[in-house]
Amino acid sequence: MSKIIIIGGGIAGLSAGIYARKAGFETTIYEKNGVPGGNCSGWNRNGYHIDNCIHWMTGTREGSTQNRIWHEVGALTDSMNLIKRDSFYVSEWNGQQIALWRDVERTRQEMLAISPEDEKEINCFIDYVRLADTVLTSRQEPKELLHTIDEMTFSLTHAEMAKAFIQYIGLNLEELAMKFKHPLLQHIFLDFMAKEYEAYWLLLAYSFFVSGNGDLPEGGSMGVVHHMTETYRSLGGKLELNTPVEQILINKEKLSIEPPIDKNTLKTKKLKKLIARNADGVRLYNGKTVSADYIICACDINYTFRQLLKKSYIPKSIKKVYSNKKDYPLYSSFQVAFSVDGLLDE
């Protein structure tokens, strides 16, 4: 039986381990922390639970592709309850409130009541969300998709919908917010994530929520990780906690590999053979070396190419991201949790 070492016990690492076990591989996940889950985590503080990750979960709608995957890895189960909120989130400014409701028409009407002068941008935003919702909830078969679009009764024509779609590409949240005149409407877009984030992330996330594909699993982040960990272990997978990996061991012998491409279909110059080396194990920080047939890095990409492997192994596509900080900025984030004496609405 071939052996796979997986570095990192987060959602990616647990998923890789589960699918590898189902495929018949021997697997060991090495996780540096005392609990699995990675960023999908939470803490108990003074009688409160602080969830670090899942504010909504893409793939909660039955029948969606992601829902099937979540069930395969044990993140969701048929017996698990889903928390279905009425609103995605609520923003407040100067004593006024506005929400992104599951009912998008309610969102539209409340936005229009607050700022009639923003009617054009409000309709553009809501219609785009409805369009994205329709596309995301369809099977995306060409005939079905065209039929669905023909049945739409938006306030915009098809040509205008295409124009609206193009208008959102390349915008960040701050640029989207500044399209609106009313400060409260500006705030609801800026309260989602950092202002530098691409605007389409909000549009997609909200459309997932509207379609019932972005609800919250009961138990939150820790519950999802617990179910996935139990699924992995029930399949016979090994999980080593508090065991950081220091380095991936590379075999010195060079291999000559034919490109995995059908050269007859390419109208380019002759492709050269690939010169590569095999990774055949890892060295742990405790000094122990472990051999394996395959290594999967399911950890931070920066740690992978600056610690586990030499910088010379960084692919050109990733090197471009590292060297161009203007077009590919990196953000830091922090989370603040407040203890409130009283009941809160959504």
Label each residue range with its predicted role.
Residues 92-111, 115-118, 132-133, 233-234, ...:
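Feature captures the FAD/FMN-dependent oxidoreductase FAD-binding
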Residues 2-134:
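N-terminal glycine-rich phosphate/pyrophosphate-binding loop and immediately adjacent elements
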Residues 7, 30, 242, 297-299:
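Generic beta-strand/beta-sheet core signal
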Residues 130-235, 242:
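Active-site/ligand-binding neighborhood in enzyme catalytic cores
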Residues 39-40, 188, 306-309:
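Short, solvent-exposed loop/turn and secondary-structure capping segments
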Residues 21-26, 76, 223, 229-242, ...:
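Secondary-structure transition/capping motifs at alpha-helix termini
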Residues 216, 246-346:
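Mid-domain catalytic core of redox enzymes
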